[in-house]
């Protein structure tokens, strides 16, 4: 490595150099292209890590990111990890040689790579749109416990005392999902209704296969069908996100149950389809496109700071931004039906 990279602070005999170069040629080794400091400053590429592109939530984040990048004359390259550790690791290994102007994670990095992510962040501006507390990098935070609590409080205020929460797999890798469920359950526990919430989560296999365009919709649909085959006393169902909520609604309507007359439904994310008049889904707004814009804004500030004539004397800032979630009441929630 030192021979091929022509390290200035070490020396080797001509014979050694020739042997190494000959071996490298025979093996087909190609020395990675190096960027000079000058060229690296001219990089106009922002890399975005996404776990999936099948949920409009991530498309909304990308729109926010791209709107700022375009304004500033930057391009955006999306790395779809498909929630697979191997793919995420491959992309991370590419980052030093790609040397983008900035990197944005639209979800929590896998804990196995957090050290690597923090190391990259020391050299390249990097922002995480996350729910992980105490990350040592710039982050757009979201309190998912508060989101779950807000969903539960709305249903409690409408008199729902037997409810279900439907979610994708609640694994250690997806802690933001678990926190949303925990916030929901704790709100019911405060009212002495610890046994009022039924949690139905998809099997872990859902996160291990390549997601299809309707994966989360099918989780909502399938688990609601399963729930209805087991019991009919539930008066409200919460979906971890809006796509799951759409599946819940279709499963209920297939069983001739009215929404919200028989069963209320609430989602989260306020994606574009939730606002359409025929759907009109009650949901939680947490300002997804603005999070994307903020993440890209932070990258731009870091780039400008690094290019400043006074960059060596400026303090290093870590940005943490959080939006307060907001309940959006529409037509899929109503007062709990009375027992007959």
Each language-model region and where it sits:
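N-terminal helix-turn-helix/winged-helix DNA-binding helices
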Residues: 24-57, 61-63, 72, 95-97
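Central regulatory/effector-binding core of bacterial HTH transcription factors
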Residues: 67-111
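Flexible loop/hinge segments that line or gate small-molecule binding clefts
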Residues: 106-150, 166-171, 243, 269-281
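Hydrophobic alpha-helical segments within soluble ligand-binding/sensing domains
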Residues: 140-166, 182, 186, 217-226, ...
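An alpha-beta-alpha
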Residues: 151-193, 198, 313-332
């Amino acid at each position: 490595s030192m021979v091929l990279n022509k390290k200035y602070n070490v020396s080797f005999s001509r014979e050694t150099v020739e042997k190494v170069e000959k071996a490298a040629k025979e093996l087909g080794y190609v020395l990675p292209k190096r960027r000079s400091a000058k060229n690296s400053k001219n990089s106009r590429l922002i890399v975005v890590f996404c776990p999936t592109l099948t949920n409009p939530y991530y498309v909304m984040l990308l729109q926010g990111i791209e709107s700022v990048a375009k304004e500033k004359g930057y391009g955006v390259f999306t790395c779809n990890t498909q929630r697979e550790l191997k793919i995420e690791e491959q992309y991370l290994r590419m980052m030093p040689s790609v040397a983008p102007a900035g990197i944005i994670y639209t979800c929590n990095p896998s804990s196995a790579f957090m050290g690597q992510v923090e190391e990259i962040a020391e050299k390249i501006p990097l922002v995480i749109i996350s729910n992980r507390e105490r990350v040592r990098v710039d982050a757009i935070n979201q309190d998912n416990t508060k989101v779950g609590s807000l969903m539960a409080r709305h249903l409690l205020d409408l008199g729902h005392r037997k409810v279900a929460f439907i979610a994708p797999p609640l694994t250690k890798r997806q802690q933001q999902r678990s926190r949303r469920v925990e916030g929901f359950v704790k709100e019911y526990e405060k009212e002495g209704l610890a046994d009022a919430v039924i949690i139905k989560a998809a099997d872990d296999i859902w996160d291990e296969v390549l997601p299809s365009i309707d994966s989360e919709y099918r989780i909502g649909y399938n688990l609601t069908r399963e729930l209805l085959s087991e019991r009919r006393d539930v008066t409200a169902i919460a979906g971890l996100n809006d796509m799951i909520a759409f599946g819940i609604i279709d499963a209920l309507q297939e069983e001739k149950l009215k929404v919200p007359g028989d069963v209320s439904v609430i989602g989260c994310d306020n994606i574009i389809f939730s606002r359409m008049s025929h759907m009109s889904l009650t949901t939680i707004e947490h300002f997804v496109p603005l999070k994307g814009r903020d993440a890209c804004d932070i990258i731009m500030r870091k780039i400008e700071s690094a290019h400043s004539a006074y960059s060596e004397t400026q303090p290093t800032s870590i940005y943490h931004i959080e939006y307060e979630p907001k309940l959006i009441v529409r037509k899929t929630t109503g007062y709990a039906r009375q027992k007959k």
